[in-house]
């Protein structure tokens, strides 16, 4: 095993009990998929492989904290816990700082109020990797899991679907609204050329799903 594989194996042991608490789609399976995307993007786009791989595997600690605290916890608030995960890893001080930086900024969106504030390839790849797991078939499944956990309706036909109303999932009128308002935008939100190509294919599937779902639930067949 190379150095990254050894470190990820250590993180798997640390992360298992912590992330097994999650039922919202931010569990170990999500971390493993995000890691795969991150390493693929790194192979095409470059960047520090250790920083990218490790940050991909521990980026969602704030989601577990959100479940525990009963409120949204930002990535910034999770940094002390993230530090505990990486303190004993065989990394340089600069690499550890870079991991913390990437994790802190991984939930920035071009269509969000604040936009994207980072430009280093490691942070951009982490954003893309996390967002790719919200696209396509897996993204749809995760959206419904999150919606169910937060008591959201699957679909509320009384509320129009708008293109300009992004919010956190639990504030949307239904899971279908969240898929429409956020997941459909992710292809245009990707930072790297490689991620844009992957997301474009996934987004076509999401659009087809939404069209069919609304037809089946409203009876407005086309």
Q: Where is each model-derived feature located?
A:
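His-Asp-centered metal-binding catalytic motifs of divalent-metal-dependent phosphohydrolases/nucleases
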Residues: 49-68, 74, 78, 99-109
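Hydrophobic, well-structured mid-protein blocks that either form specific transmembrane helices
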Residues: 89-125
């Amino acid at each position: 095993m190379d150095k990254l594989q050894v470190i990820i194996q250590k993180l798997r042991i640390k992360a298992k009990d912590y992330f097994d608490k999650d039922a919202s789609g931010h569990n170990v399976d999500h971390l493993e998929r995000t890691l795969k995307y991150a390493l693929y993007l790194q192979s095409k786009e470059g960047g520090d492989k250790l920083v990218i791989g490790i940050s991909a595997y521990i980026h969602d600690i704030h989601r577990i904290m959100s479940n525990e605290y009963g409120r949204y916890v930002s990535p910034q608030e999770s940094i002390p816990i993230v530090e505990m995960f990486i303190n004993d890893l065989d990394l340089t001080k600069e690499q550890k700082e870079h991991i913390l930086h990437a994790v802190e900024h991984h939930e920035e969106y071009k269509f969000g109020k604040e936009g994207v504030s980072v430009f280093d390839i490691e942070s951009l790849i982490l954003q893309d990797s996390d967002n790719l797991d919200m696209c396509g078939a897996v993204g749809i499944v995760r959206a419904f899991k999150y919606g169910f956990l937060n008591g959201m309706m699957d679909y509320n036909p009384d509320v129009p679907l708008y293109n300009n109303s992004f919010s956190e999932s639990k504030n949307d009128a239904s899971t279908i609204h969240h898929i429409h308002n956020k997941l459909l935008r992710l292809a245009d939100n990707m930072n790297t050329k490689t991620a844009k190509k992957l997301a474009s294919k996934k987004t076509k599937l999401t659009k087809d799903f939404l069209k069919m779902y609304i037809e089946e639930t409203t009876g407005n067949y086309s």
